[in-house]
């Protein structure tokens, strides 16, 4: 099953397969969550283990990899000179459903915008790069750190990259936001440049990069896959704002062009 990345305020534990229409409220310091009757929410990790979690993913042994913001809000042009964001590996040592041990798996990252555990490595998107971290001796600290993909752009809002996501076809997918110009070496088309938004995919060795979708939307944010392998993408500014419309979901058919008219599509 492809893991979904989500903010780690809480992790929901499903207690019943079928829920009734009744609702239950669970109150936490961060707010109140309302769920259908028969579902429960428990805090799986909180301070001091994690303070500002951004994304999570599990490995095959149930250990949790949490990307965390350092809390800085200085401009990205300054952040990139001394990146301060981190990745933690959390372990539930006694099996009670609450994580109780932490190691700093990786540090010195730009703002994390996605994470994916795949075949023994953790892929983390931190514009302008997607990193591949590997902990060969399993001590909870990644000793191997390599740039899996380098977009070579970093805009003020850092929408240059989102992802990565594992497709049903075994490829690794990621999103490019508009409107920075990036250059890709595509099979048979080296030096291909684009300012448009895209979904891209590649093999896990980063070879055979190809665009899956092209668009005039501002910021493709997330991609999920149906059991049949169909791609569903969420994005901001799918259409020009007006009449209560702006963001949207797209059934991302291979080779499709979507979103509002924009000069980046010319």
Predicted regions, residues:
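N-terminal secretory signal peptides that target proteins for export/translocation
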Residues: 1-4
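Beta-propeller blade termini and top-face loops
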Residues: 24-266
């Amino acid at each position: 099953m492809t893991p979904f990345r989500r903010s780690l305020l809480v992790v929901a534990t499903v207690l019943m397969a079928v829920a009734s229409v009744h609702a239950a409220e669970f109150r936490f310091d961060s707010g109140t969550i309302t769920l259908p009757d028969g579902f429960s929410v428990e805090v799986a990790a909180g301070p001091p283990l994690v303070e500002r979690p951004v994304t999570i993913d599990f490995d095959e042994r149930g250990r949790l990899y949490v990307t965390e913001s350092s809390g800085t809000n200085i401009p990205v042009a300054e952040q990139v000179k001394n990146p301060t964001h981190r990745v933690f590996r959390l372990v539930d040592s006694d099996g009670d459903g609450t994580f109780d041990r932490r190691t700093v798996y990786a540090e010195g990252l730009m703002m994390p915008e996605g994470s994916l555990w795949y075949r023994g490595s953790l892929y983390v998107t931190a514009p302008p790069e997607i990193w591949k971290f590997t902990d060969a001796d399993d001590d909870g600290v990644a000793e191997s750190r390599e740039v899996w993909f380098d977009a070579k752009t970093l805009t003020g809002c850092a929408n240059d990259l989102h992802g990565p996501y594992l497709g049903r076809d075994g490829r690794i997918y990621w999103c490019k936001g508009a409107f920075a110009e990036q250059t890709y070496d595509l099979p048979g088309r080296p030096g291909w440049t684009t300012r448009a938004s895209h979904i891209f995919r590649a093999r896990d060795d980063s070879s055979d990069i190809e665009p899956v979708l092209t668009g005039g939307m501002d910021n493709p944010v997330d991609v999920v896959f149906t059991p049949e392998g169909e791609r569903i993408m969420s994005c901001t500014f799918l259409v020009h704002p007006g009449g209560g419309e702006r963001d949207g979901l797209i059934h991302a058919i291979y080779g499709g062009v979507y979103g509002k008219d924009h000069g980046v599509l010319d």
